[in-house]
Amino acid sequence: MSNPVESASFFEKVPLPAVNAARFPDYHPALTAQAAVVEANRCLFCFDAPCAQACPTHIDVPRFIKKIASENLAGSARTILEANILGASCSRACPVDVLCEGACVLHRYNKQPIEIGRLQRFAMDAFHASGAPLPFDPGVPTGKSVALIGAGPASLACAAELRRAGIRAVLYDARPLPGGLNTYGIAEYKLPLAESLREIDML
């Protein structure tokens, strides 16, 4: 069995090569601050929110978008992270066209659905750029520990929840870097390696 993945700055160890960035530009480019506010204000903030119901992690979509509209980016990111600790990578890799955006009520009126994925990415990118720590305190140490086999998204999310419960998590993986599919299996133009590792570094 390989050594446990220790807490380290993987983002600094493996920078994104410039040639990769040139060859594989973003499939869905990041929104500017102005474009994000304009897009957020298109949202109807539905009470029953079919977009949130279609989200596998049940992010409160209207709430995080409303906070973008009011330029409360920290609050928006917190709303996302409360439901999905891997909200940054999901904002880039999630098939939103068949999930949240596919459920947007604007389809009923032959309108372009709200770009939920890009708005989520905007909020999470702003959160990462701020250098703020995760908005959750670790739980009181219980003295317990759990071994997680594989350091993919499921194990990372589990480790974060365990830490909030005061339980130490040790991740084991056959590969040198954590992240599983996020790090090794998603095309660079959707989820760059450096972005996956930056999110893991934050965790």
Please state what every model-predicted region is.
Residues I114, G185-L203:
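N-terminal glycine-rich dinucleotide-binding loop that anchors FAD/FMN and/or NAD(P) in oxidoreductases
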Residues I85, G152-P153, L177:
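Residue-level detector of alpha-helix initiation sites
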Residues S145-V170:
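N-terminal Rossmann-like FAD-binding beta1-loop-alpha1 element of flavoenzymes
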Residues V140, S145-I149, L197-M202:
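Feature captures the FAD/FMN-dependent oxidoreductase FAD-binding
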Residues I167-T183:
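Glycine-rich FAD pyrophosphate-binding loop
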Residues M1-S145:
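Ferredoxin-type iron-sulfur electron-transfer modules and their immediate structural context
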